Amino acid sequence: RPLNVPINEALVSYEVDGEQVNGIIVQPSPGEAPYPGVVVCHPHPLFGGDMNSSVVIAICSALAHRGIASLRFNFRQSVEGEKLNETSVRDVETGLQMFDGWEMVNSVRLGVVGYSFGAAAIARASTSLTSARALAFVSPPVAAIKKSSLGDDTRPRYFIVGGRDRLVDAEALSEVVSSMKSQANFETLD
């Protein structure tokens, strides 16, 4: 699709465990609904990460220009120090369920993508994200990927890291991904 395709954005709010989660649904327009859909998870809130992260917005925009709807949301107080906890996992699970139920999204063409902390949350929640047909990870923490069950996952998985990323060791991530079962792809961007 050409890059000049108009994009519609809508603020959404939904409940997770009795608390409000705010998000934005980005929908390509014009387009033929129901759209494929992707839930996009942001980097660590303690380091300024939220749904308006430049990388998250770029991902959502790129998806919309390709005819794919997206949901990005702000994690609730999802951290204990710098650690991931079950709150962030529930936020991803519920966001995907909510998006799956949206009439403009094709429920058999869903995926999830996470950036940094968001990638770790998806890795931890991956076994419960059964409606996601594909998983993507941008600069994921290597330890989170190692600890997850992604190695045995049979869905398509895509891992991408910048060649000059100071937090993610591209070589270590490449080794972890290469040991996974089928459909796991790794790319380093320079």
Model-derived regions, located:
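Conserved alpha/beta-hydrolase "acid-adjacent" motif
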Residues: 166-172
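Catalytic histidine neighborhood in serine/cysteine hydrolases
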Residues: 71, 179-190
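An N-terminal hydrophobic leader/cap segment in hydrolases
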Residues: 1-15, 21-31, 110-112, 117
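The conserved SAM/SAH-binding core of class I Rossmann-like methyltransferase domains
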Residues: 71-73, 138, 160
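Short beta-strand/loop motif that positions the catalytic acidic residue
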Residues: 153-154, 158-161, 165
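Serine-hydrolase catalytic machinery in alpha/beta-hydrolase-like enzymes
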Residues: 14-105
